[in-house]
């Protein structure tokens, strides 16, 4: 596809780092859930573990906007995302609600046993965020503050987003980023491509959504009476 050709032509293999903007700020008054993941992000099925984090995107005005992601650890599929002009917890809660609604619509709703893992940023330790997790069928798990290894899968996905979607020479950009809507558009297009077309090496060069579909097809095929 055009995106893949442009990526190869540009030789994109990593992120060119600029001055880091701090997005993870802990709330010293907030209670924190235990770390139920302990850096073990490989799971045998969807809906067992989702990871979450957010990053910043700089507009041409110098103002930052923020993009939050919810990622299923099984195939790395992005199941929820939201862009916001502020770092208030509303936008990370919205990403969670999107993930829950998507899984319900697909007939595979989140259960109370689904773990939601994030860092210890204040957005993810707020009371309202905890309520959103509970209502969405998720059990909280919290890593440390600002340690990339404690949330490595989310950090990796965000790195791909910054490289493949946000960079000035990205094929998903239609020009300078003037406003929040510009970031929302490029994010929507990148997420769709990432889920449906990006070949993932750890999935034997299969896109995330296809890898999930193959898993569910195997489940159906092994059910009693499936071949009757």
Stretches found by the model and what they are:
Residues 1-228:
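Charged DNA-binding/catalytic regions of mobile-element recombinases
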